[in-house]
Amino acid sequence: MSIFERFNEETREFFQNIMDKEPLNYLEASGLYGVIAQGRYNVSVLETLYNHAQNAELKHLIKQAQDSLTKSLINRSEDLLQESGGKIPSVTFPRRTLHKAPLEIHPDARLTDAEVAIAIGSIAKASQLAMLAALHQSYQVEVALMYRTLLNDGLDWDYRLLQLMLKNGWLPKLHKVVN
């Protein structure tokens, strides 16, 4: 190890001790990068599903998932990645207008409310699994806390979706298995 490398190491250690904050490791940075890119795609899909939905409660849940969960996660992830000197994904998707009134979509092309609910439930479960994996790879308290908070919020949202699906009969009736 050269004198210059040793000096750099000592300087880095000194500042990390003062600031008590390490830079993101590769797993954390790549996790945030993936969360941002996938989140942007999910916003686009949620906008499309919102326009297919007929049920007002379902539309409200989709809007909540988009604004309170997905966009919040994207913004917080971008902030953390930028603070650590990481590059933000350049991928973008077209924005869609959210129509409160039902659109005239041919019945053969329109998703039913049950299909929309199942689709957003699948997106939610995949997102929660990805956040859980990213949480387990996090060493930074701030990053782990962000994932934990949003994962808890997502699970609460998922429960409300499940209740709506049960109330409207969008889930199949499963009979008890008796031996």
Where are these regions (language model features)?
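Preference for long, well-ordered alpha-helical segments
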Residues: 123-179
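Carboxylate-rich helix-loop segments that flank metal/cofactor sites and access channels
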Residues: 4-15, 79-118, 177-179
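Leu/Val/Ala/Ile-rich N-terminal alpha-helices, chiefly Sec-type signal peptides and the beginnings
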Residues: 1-39
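Acidic/histidine-rich alpha-helical segments that form the ligand environment
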Residues: 28-51, 100-148
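A cross-kingdom feature marking solvent-exposed beta-strand/loop segments within repeated
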Residues: 13-24, 30, 57-61, 106, ...
